[in-house]
A protein has these predicted regions:
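Aromatic- and glycine-rich beta-strand/loop motifs that create alpha-glucan
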Residues: 1-22
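Membrane-interfacial helix-loop-helix connectors in multipass membrane proteins
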Residues: 37-47, 111-132, 176-185
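Long, hydrophobic alpha-helical segments
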Residues: 48-68
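Transmembrane helix boundary and interhelical loop/hinge segments in multi-pass membrane proteins
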Residues: 61-81, 208
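Membrane-interface alpha-helices at helix entry/exit sites of multi-pass transporters
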Residues: 85-99, 126, 160
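Hydrophobic alpha-helical transmembrane segments that constitute the membrane-spanning cores
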Residues: 92-118, 137, 141, 174
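A structural motif at transmembrane helix-loop-helix junctions in multipass membrane proteins
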Residues: 132-164, 205-208
Length: 208
């Protein structure tokens, strides 16, 4: 059932006209920052991890209004509940699909962003590993925020306010991925977020 739910969610993402929006945003941020920072290649390479992590966080939030709100509004969530499917399973599948839909394209686009920001090969590899370990936490936080704001007007803005402070530890560990233990901390943060996220999102979606 879990795989069927993930497949359904991925098909919905693939049919969305905004499919490429997160990765386009990610690359555009990487392309624009060199103009803002100036010609100092060393400075640009030094701040590149922070730029890429902030871009990844914001990219994870771009589709937040479409993660759960449409299913709440059209009754899909109620139908799944009536069929005896646990909301926790639905939310876990949505987290997985959201990660596959935004993080995998971002990882594929990372070499382009790295070239634009002047990252060398070793730094780019470390950053790629850090994103692989840390983006599941961002996906989980985005789905929890989507559940909390489903059905609210302006839910996307509110979801951003919810996620940004909670994502700070992930950004701190991600930017410091050249420090010993940062990868382990990123992995631990993602495991905690993935363990708690489906239950928190399901609790927010359950009818009163």
């Amino acid at each position: 059932m879990f795989l069927a739910l993930v497949r359904r969610d991925l098909l919905l993402i693939a049919r969305s006209p905004a499919l490429w929006l997160p990765v386009m945003f990610f690359v555009l941020v990487a392309a624009i920052f060199p103009f803002a920072v100036g010609p100092d290649a060393r400075l640009l390479a030094r701040i590149a991890p922070g730029i890429i992590w902030v871009a990844a966080l914001l990219a994870s939030l771009l589709p937040v209004e479409t993660l759960l709100a449409p299913d709440v509004e059209d009754g899909t969530i109620d139908q799944l509940i009536s069929r005896g499917i646990a909301l926790e399973l639905v939310c876990a599948a949505r987290i997985c699909a959201h990660w596959l839909g935004f993080a995998v394209p971002l990882l594929a686009a990372l070499p382009v962003a790295g070239v634009l920001l002047g990252l060398d090969g070793d730094a780019g590899t470390r950053l790629g590993i850090a994103l692989l370990l840390g983006t599941p936490a961002l996906a989980s936080l985005a789905v929890v925020a989507a559940a909390l704001t489903a059905g609210l007007k302006g839910g996307g803005a509110l979801a951003g306010l919810i996620v940004l402070p909670l994502a700070l530890p992930v950004l701190i560990f991600g930017v410091g991925s050249d420090v010993d233990g940062a990868f382990r901390l990123l992995g631990a943060a993602s495991l905690v977020a993935l363990a708690i996220g489906p239950f928190a999102a399901a609790a927010a979606l359950k009818p009163e």
